[in-house]
């Protein structure tokens, strides 16, 4: 794969990996953590999801739409994002301990996990052969992600500072974490 395409893919895969770590942490907390810890983790995960999807849609998907002949895979990814957004909106109306809270987040995690697999195995490999402005696209993705993470009070993570892929968050719970 071209170096330029791989830079974008690495950036987005870092987000995907962060989400998968959060989903695994949710499963552990669901089986024995406090409701407060569960609520905080879900809020963090939903914020991560919203930031990632917005950056991806506004930059990568827009560039892919201009460069791809067959838009079916991209359209499928957009529909998956819409489904995930609906589930995030549903989570925003709930509190840990509510009926269906754990089930709703589990469905959200499952939908997003399938979407991640779809992107990484079908959509990302197509990028290599496309005529995309990789340098500016990578810069735009990084900058917009940083801006959104700052806006939501989320620390930017530096993979070199982390221990073997574990992500640490130092975010105070926000009672109004709506992303709309």
PLM region descriptions:
Residues 1-180:
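Small-residue-biased structural context
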């Amino acid at each position: 794969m071209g170096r330029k395409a791989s830079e974008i893919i690495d950036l987005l895969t870092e987000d995907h990996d962060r989400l998968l770590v959060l989903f695994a942490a949710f499963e552990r907390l669901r089986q024995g953590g406090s409701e407060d810890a569960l609520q905080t983790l879900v809020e963090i995960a939903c914020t991560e999801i919203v930031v990632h999807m917005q950056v991806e849609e506004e930059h990568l998907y827009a560039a892919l739409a201009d460069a791809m002949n067959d838009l079916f895979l991209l359209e499928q990814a957009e529909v998956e994002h819409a489904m995930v957004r609906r589930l995030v909106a549903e989570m925003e109306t709930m509190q840990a301990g509510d009926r269906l809270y754990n089930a709703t987040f589990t469905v959200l995690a499952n939908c997003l996990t399938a979407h991640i697999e779809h992107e990484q195995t079908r959509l990302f490999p197509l990028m290599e052969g496309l005529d995309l402005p990789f340098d500016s696209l990578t810069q735009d993705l990084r900058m917009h992600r940083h801006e959104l993470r700052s806006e939501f009070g989320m620390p930017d993570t530096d993979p070199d500072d982390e221990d073997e892929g574990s992500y640490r968050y130092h975010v105070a719970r926000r009672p109004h974490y709506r992303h709309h």
